[in-house]
């Protein structure tokens, strides 16, 4: 009985192969079975503990016979189960290794797909971040541009107000017809005042004349104010610099508006840049893979294409820089054209102002001549009054009785005033260029006019001498005349001549005065 229990139990190789082929090895169940082996019944455990299991050779398998008996068969089946499981696990592992060795390309494809997914996710995140940064920069730039625009608009409004003020001053400087009439009225009143001062008969002026004097003083103040404004008519250098600065700021505003209208980059170029960034990322990824694995020839060709495409973004950046430079040059050209136009306008204004200043100077000269003529007219009126006084002395009467000559002098003076006083239309309007050309074509007429003016200057000097003589005569006439008592003889004292003149008869003096006046010009 003891020998029966010690006999080894073996299986034929055909049965073991059939079991391996028919039963597939489950992966999960193998691990569980390895962790938790199936327990054996107690009689089998004792037999296994006492006797080792021996694997017989092929020759012994032929001579061995199966022992019939229920307990032995159960023990054999229970012993075969862990062995079969170990064999199945080994076979499965070998099968997996064989599949891995046969399919390296599938593994590369799977790894490549995983890496592509990771790259796409990373690129999408970077794209979102770049979009956010671009939006923030655009918002900041728009805010800065708005602030600059507001500042420039405020400066332009202030300087426009200054320009309007200057234009108002220029309008005030152009004397209207009413102010010219006031000037003439003032000159007449000044002549009356001088005439009253010369007479000196009225020690106290009436209330009307006092009011007239105050009114004259006010008008003189207005004249001084107008002259002061005329001096300010020429625009100072500071205002000219402000005007140039204004023009530059307006050009900058237009340039900023143009920049706002033009997008930074068109959509096509933005898409190209993004595509190039993706290709660069792919290049880096391919280089990393190239270091890890030996790449086939197709991937090497792709690498070369990608390297060629790397040079394209540099070319695009150069084109973008050239476009920006061209846009800046166009803005500068427009700004220069605007500056030239504004300078031409300012030159025209300056020429117009210079013409006005020359006209004002000419008017002032004519006003001075008018004042001088009015003074002479007042002196002649005084002489007429003196002619109407009683003649106490015969010699004084002969010298003072020249009404006809004085009337001729008055008429001649009136003609001179009419010639000197330019009409208002000629003062307000410049001469027509055709008239100026005609005047230039006849230099003889201009020489005649110059000679005539020199004669008038000589006449004015003679009138001043006559004025001195008349003042002396007036002083002699104002001396009290004593009537002679009856029986007395009055000594008639002749009037002594002035220094430098000999005593001439009345007829010679009349001839001398007639010679001094030139013949009338047609």
Swiss-Prot record:
Source organism superkingdom: Eukaryota
Biased composition regions of type Basic and acidic residues, renumbered to the chain: 92-126, 182-198, 214-231, 252-264, 274-290, 305-323, 391-401, 409-418, 431-465
Disordered, as annotated region: 1-126, 159-329, 366-496
Tissue: Keratinocytes of epidermis and other stratified squamous epithelia.
Compositionally skewed regions (Polar residues) per UniProt: 1-15
Primary localization class, coarse: cytoplasm
GO-annotated biological processes: keratinization; keratinocyte differentiation; peptide cross-linking; response to UV-B
InterPro entries: Involucrin_CS (IPR019743), Involucrin_N (IPR019571), Involucrin_rpt (IPR000354)
One Gene Ontology term, aspect cellular component: cornified envelope
One Pfam match: Involucrin_N
Post-translational modification as stated in the protein's UniProt record: Substrate of transglutaminase. Specific glutamines or lysines are cross-linked to keratins, desmoplakin and to inter involucrin molecules.
Function, as annotated: Part of the insoluble cornified cell envelope (CE) of stratified squamous epithelia.
Subunit structure: Directly or indirectly cross-linked to cornifelin (CNFN).
Family membership noted in the UniProt record: Belongs to the involucrin family.
Protein name: Involucrin
Lineage start: Eukaryota, Metazoa, Chordata, Craniata, Vertebrata
Gene designation per UniProt: IVL
């Amino acid at each position: 009985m003891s020998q029966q229990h010690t006999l080894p139990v073996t299986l034929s190789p055909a049965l073991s192969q059939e079991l391996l082929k028919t039963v597939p090895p489950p992966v999960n169940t193998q691990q569980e079975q390895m962790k938790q082996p199936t327990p054996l019944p107690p009689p089998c455990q004792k037999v296994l503990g006492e006797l080792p299991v021996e694997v017989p050779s092929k020759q012994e398998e032929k001579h061995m016979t199966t022992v019939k008996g229920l307990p032995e068969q159960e023990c054999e089946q229970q012993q075969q189960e862990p062995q079969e499981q170990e064999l199945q696990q080994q076979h499965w592992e070998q099968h997996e290794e064989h599949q891995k060795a046969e399919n390296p390309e599938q593994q590369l494809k799977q790894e490549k797909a995983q890496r592509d997914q990771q790259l796409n996710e990373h690129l999408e995140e970077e794209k979102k971040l770049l979009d956010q940064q671009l939006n923030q920069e655009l918002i900041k730039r728009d805010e800065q541009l708005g602030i600059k625009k507001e500042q420039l608009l405020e400066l332009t409004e202030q300087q426009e107000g200054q320009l309007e003020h200057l234009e108002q001053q220029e309008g005030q400087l152009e004397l209207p017809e009413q102010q010219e009439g006031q000037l003439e009225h003032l000159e007449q009143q000044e002549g009356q005042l001088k005439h009253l001062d010369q007479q000196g008969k009225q020690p106290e002026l009436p209330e009307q004349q006092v009011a007239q004097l105050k009114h004259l003083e006010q008008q003189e103040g207005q004249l001084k104010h107008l002259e002061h404004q005329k001096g300010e008519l020429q625009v100072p250098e500071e205002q000219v610099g402000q005007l140039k600065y204004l023009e530059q700021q307006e050009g900058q505003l237009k340039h900023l508006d143009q920049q706002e209208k033009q997008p930074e980059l068109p959509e096509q170029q933005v898409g190209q840049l993004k595509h190039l960034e993706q290709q660069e990322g792919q290049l880096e990824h391919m280089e990393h893979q190239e270091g890890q694995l030996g790449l086939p020839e197709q991937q090497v060709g792709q690498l070369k294409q990608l390297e060629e495409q790397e040079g394209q973004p540099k070319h695009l950046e150069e084109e973008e820089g050239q476009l920006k430079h061209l846009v800046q040059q166009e803005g500068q050209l427009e700004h220069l054209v605007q500056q030239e136009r504004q300078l031409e306008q300012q030159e025209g204004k300056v020429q117009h102002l210079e013409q006005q200043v020359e006209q004002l100077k000419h008017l002032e000269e004519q006003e001075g001549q008018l004042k001088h003529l009015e003074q002479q007219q007042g002196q002649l009126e005084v002489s007429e009054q003196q002619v109407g006084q009683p003649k106490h002395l015969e010699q004084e009467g002969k010298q003072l009785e020249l009404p006809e000559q004085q009337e001729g002098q008055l008429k001649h003076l009136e003609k001179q005033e009419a010639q000197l006083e330019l009409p208002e239309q000629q003062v307000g309007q410049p001469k027509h260029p055709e008239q100026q050309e005609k005047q230039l074509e006849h230099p003889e007429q201009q020489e005649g006019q110059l000679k005539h003016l020199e004669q008038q200057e000589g006449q004015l000097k003679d009138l001043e001498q006559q004025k001195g003589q008349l003042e002396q005569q007036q002083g002699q006439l104002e001396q009290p005349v004593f009537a002679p008592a009856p029986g007395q003889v009055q000594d008639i004292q002749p009037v002594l001549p002035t220094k430098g003149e000999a005593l001439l008869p009345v007829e010679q003096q009349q001839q001398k005065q007639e010679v001094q006046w030139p013949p009338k010009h047609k």
